[in-house]
Curated annotation (Swiss-Prot):
Example GO molecular function: glycerol-3-phosphate dehydrogenase [NAD(P)+] activity
Binding site for NADPH: 13-14, 34, 105, 138, 253, 277, 279
Name assigned to this protein: Glycerol-3-phosphate dehydrogenase [NAD(P)+]
Organism: Legionella pneumophila (strain Paris)
Domain of life, per lineage: Bacteria
SUPFAM superfamilies for the chain: 6-phosphogluconate dehydrogenase C-terminal domain-like, NAD(P)-binding Rossmann-fold domains
Amino acid sequence: MNKKTIAMLGAGSWGTAVAIHLAKIGHKTLLWSHNPQHVALMAEQHSNPAYLPGIPFPENLIPSDDLIECVQLADYVIIAVPSHAFAEIINKIPKPTQGLAWLTKGVDPASHQLLSQLVASRFGVDFPIAVISGPSFAKEVARFLPTALTLASNNTNYQKKMHQLFHHDNIRVYLSDDLIGVQLCGAVKNILAIACGISDGLGYGANAKAALITRGLAEMTRLGLSMGARQDTFLGLAGVGDLVLTCTDDQSRNRRFGLLLGREVPIPEAEHQIGQVVEGKHNAAQICAIANKNKVEMPICEQINALLHGIVHAQQAVNNLMSRPAKEE
């Protein structure tokens, strides 16, 4: 593939890591942040000390705070902002020429819509889109360690171009057309990672964590099937792959947040200690609302949502789950 200009909108750890990957394989990459001071610091230090310290930028990775210019200069636009900022970004930018891809995992907090629905409302239902998801920690991608991702799209030509853009010796990209399933996996797994963190914070051990992952996967799958997703998506990289990674490794900020809650650290202090957006906290209420609308039981997600809203404490949430009526698996 000829080398392209990429606009990466969002300079958190994940957006920065993917920007570094794209720049390392030869694409000119514009890394946008809304904060001019953050941009100046990245330009001065040729790295992102706030979110991905210790990993230098390639020369062709250029920080910027000019959102419109980044989009206008780019051959391809990728969004990597938190889910609560996604709608604001797509409403500000001009329509990208090729299509729009995103790394964001979550749903819109205001409308409870999938991010693909927001984009369809803004740019049209036939506008090419792609969602990139899967088991991937930022530092490992930035360090060129082997990673496999799922790329779901509504347009085969655009999907092929995005595949060529990302695919390299260190990143293997699998293709999907299940936009609903891939997006739901990315949103729900963060809530389940909080649950696993809480369980470990309470000292409950490996058995409890395995049960949460397994029953959490069942919840995720039920919700997806009710919305038209395919079951095999939940058994793939975007589903069980990302779920296991996020629930078991302390690089996951959602899991670390749960660990703190399990150790009785107050929610505001836990968020402060994490220092970055905890998507599972922001998306728990939205996922529960979507589940209620679709008449799907998601008891683990419901207990995490209740805990986050101060209705139950960690031990009580566990007791509520363990005392549920017996049922077939």
